[in-house]
Structures are given as structure tokens and as C-alpha cells.
Amino acid sequence: MKSVLASGALTLAFSLAALAADAFQASSWDSTHIIRRDVVIVGGGAAGTYAAIRLKDHGKSVVLVERRDRLGGHAVTYKDPNTGGSVDYGVQVYDNNTVVRDFFSRLNTPLADLSFASFGKPVYADFEEGMLLNLTAGTLGQDYINELNKYPYLDNGFELPDPVPEDLLLPWVEYIGKYNIDLSTAIATLARPAVTGNLLNILAIYVFNNLNHLLLHEMSGAVVVNANRDNSQLYRNAVSELQPDLLLRSRVVAGQRRTRKRDGVRLVVDTPTGRKLIIAKQLIVGMPPILDNMRTFGLDSHEHSVLSHIYGLPYYGGVVSDTGLAPGFSFKNYAANTSYNLAEIPSVVAFNPSSVDGLFYYWYNAPQPVSQRRIETEARDAIKTLQRLTNSTTQPEPKFLAFSDFAPYQLRVSAEAIRNGFYDDMYGLQGHRNTWYTGTLFVTGSSQVWNNTEVMLPEILAAVNSS
């Protein structure tokens, strides 16, 4: 039996070797399985979709590769079969700026202004201990603005001075103490939406990069939403626009990227209609460039060394009905007896009202991966606790309607890696081996991702034109 297994393993090894040897030669492929484009884009979230549309607008041919069966990344939407209404339980809002408005207009998707009141009046509760809390929402004060203004280069990425200021590498709780940040301000910085991990231990550099001047602009009320409260509509329209230059449910299984521009890139991609060879002048990586996502791209030793530092954390979201909770309220999980009343993780972050009566969406923060079953069990227990605490007139059994795993979420690297020049090295990879990186490695939020991608386009176009 062992000899049979060994023989099978040897055959597999030879098969993989054969793939590596001639997989990138067009002569080895049926012409119907070869795709030739100016640019191949891998990752169909906010970054990749925007890049594909804008490159088409500039007259370039593209192919977009996405492993899921849809575009949109963290823009996830539940469609209620009873009312036809939509519940966004990932991306919520966009900055009201020209790039955002132009992109929505380009894809014939309506926008509308938003009142933050639609997110519900906050109710603070300790989900674990089962008690309502008399808390006051923090307010960002001038003390935070003064600190943020020290680091203007963090608004649009991480083009850092050398040496990197050591203050930026402090855990946020230590930065708060060192600069005597007011309690109300500190609480506000810890209450920013959809942040993963232990909020006190996040490096200051990531707080300022996330809670930057653009986000402050949004928090002042300068936000827009899809007029139908369906953030996935933008991406459905993008699917229609990009066909047939779109490969959904597809994965890169091998890559060859040369250093000379004229040699371009070649990717072997598994698709629902068979394996394809993509031959392109340039590659844009719009997905999280963590090592596990990039191993099949034929990394050189320098790329491997740089990308190996990147990690993301778990974050989850879902939609639930039959909660028995009062409409128009946002039920937030805090703790009675911890620093800044932060709830321990893993735990549900909040239950928020949606635009569909009776449906709430929730988020769940965890330091390590957690199963959907455990998350929904804990969410169910929290809802039953809230029913009791709020004297709900009905106590139905919650029904879970949708679930999404957003990992790897909010990409980061260690303080030591930053100190040793990680971001200089990462920016140095732009254009290296005809490959470009965009997305949430540099900024958070779709609005900034689109803006940063737009800023990169002239360099990418120049590379295409000179290939």
C-alpha cells in the first residue's frame, strides 16, 4: 500500500513539475483558453472593481479575476424576500466626494444623503454580565486633532519619515496616557466603527491612519449611501459592465512575472469553464496581499520577505430577524468593569437596525477565527439577554438570515517591521515585476481605496503604454 501511495505522490509531483515547466507557453494551450489583455486584476472588491472600470475608461483592455461568485468584497447585502428591501451588513457609507460621486454615476447607481440618526439611538449594555449601562458616547476633541495633525502623511497611506516616530509604534492605550488624551476623546477613538482586534493594543499608527481627516469629514455628516440602501447594486452593475472580461469563482494557480516591461505577466487561472492562461502587460493586486493569497504568483525572495509581514484579523457580520428588540435602537456591547468599558473579545460588537423593519445586522470581533455556529449561538444568547433587559413584550427565537466572514480584515504589520522599513519596502514593490498593489493595505474604507487607486492610475497607464 505504501508503494502505491508513494507512486501516486511521485506522479503528482511530476505533474506539478510539468505544469511549472510549460504552463506559461502559449503554444501549450488551446487558443480558446488564452486571454490576452493590457492589465489583469486579481481581487474584485472595492479596489479591483474600481481599477477595472477606470482602466476601461482609459481605453485599456482588462480581465478581472475574483474567487467569489460576486464582486464587492466587504459590500455585502441581504435581500429580504418578503419586502424586497435590502440590508447592508458590511460597508455602510461613503465619503461625499467627487471620486465617489463619479464612480456611482459611471455605474448608473443612485446616491442619497444620509442622516446618522438612521443608525439608531444607542443603547449600551454588558452582553456578558446581562446589565444595561449608563454610558455617554465620547466626543473627539481638539486634543485628538492636534495629535492627528502631527502626522499628515497617514491620511492617504504610510509614506513615513525615516526614522519612523516611535510614538506611532506605541499601543494606542499607551499613546493615550503619554499625551493625556481626554477621557471623552479616548472613548470616541475606541468607538470608531468596524475595527478589529484588541482596540487598546492597536498601534497608534493604525489609529491615525484609520481615524484620519477623511473619516472625520464623514463623521461630520458628509456621507452618502446607495439610494436604495443596497451597496451591492454598484457591484452588480459593474458585473454587467465588465462582462465578458470577468472571471468569477476563479483562482490563480501559477504565475510568471518578469522584470522587463516587455515580458509582462502570465497567470494560470482555474475557472468554472476550465483552466486559462492570462497574458497581460501589467498586474494589479486588489486582494489582500497576505502571503497565503500570493504564494501562487511566483514570488521572488524579496517579495516573499516583504509580504510575509502582513496579517489581517477576523471580523464577521450577519443579519438576524425575530429579535424582539425595539426598532430604531442600536444595541452596543460594552463592559461594566473594564478599561474604557470595552467588551472582552471574542464577542458581538452591536446589533444595529436596518432599513427593513424587523431586521437587524450585527458585527462580531475576534482575535482568532471563530466558527459561524459559535458566533450565531453567542449572538442568539445576547439577543435573549437584551430581550430581558429591555422588557421586550415578545421574546421570539432569533432567525439568522445571512452571514459573512470579512477576514483578513484591516491589514497590519508589527511595530518591529514598521521600524525596519516595511512600508518603504512595500511601496518599493509598486511596479516591480510589472505588478501593482492597491486596496486596504494602505487605507481603510472604499472611499479612500478608490481615491488612492485613482492616484495610482497614471503610473500604471504609463507602464502599460511602455510595455
Curated annotation (Swiss-Prot):
Its EC number is 1.21.-.-. Disruption phenotype: Reduces the amounts of DHMDA produced. Glycans are attached at residues 96, 134, 337, 391, 451. SUPFAM superfamilies: FAD/NAD(P)-binding domain (SSF51905). Pfam families: NAD_binding_8. Residues 1-20 form the signal peptide. Its cofactor is FAD. The lineage of its organism: Eukaryota, Fungi, Dikarya, Ascomycota, Pezizomycotina. This is FAD-dependent oxidoreductase dbaF. GO terms for molecular function: oxidoreductase activity. FAD-dependent oxidoreductase; part of the gene cluster that mediates the biosynthesis of the antibiotic 2,4-dihydroxy-3-methyl-6-(2-oxopropyl)benzaldehyde (DHMBA) and its derivatives. The direct non-reducing polyketide synthase dbaI product is 2,4-dihydroxy-3-methyl-6-(2-oxopropyl)benzaldehyde (DHMBA), produced by condensation of one acetyl-CoA starter unit with 4 malonyl-CoA units and one methylation step. The FAD-dependent monooxygenase dbaH is responsible for the synthesis of yellow pigments derived from the oxidation of DHMBA. The roles of dbaB, C, E and F have still to be determined. Keywords: FAD, Flavoprotein, Glycoprotein, Oxidoreductase, Signal. Pathway: Secondary metabolite biosynthesis. Induction: Deletion of the conserved eukaryotic csnE deneddylase subunit of the COP9 signalosome leading to defect in protein degradation results in the activation of the silenced dba gene cluster. Expression is positively regulated by the dba cluster specific transcription factors dbaA and dbaG. Expression is also controlled by the transcription factor flbB. It comes from Emericella nidulans (strain FGSC A4 / ATCC 38163 / CBS 112.46 / NRRL 194 / M139) (Aspergillus nidulans). The gene is dbaF. Belongs to the beta-cyclopiazonate dehydrogenase family.
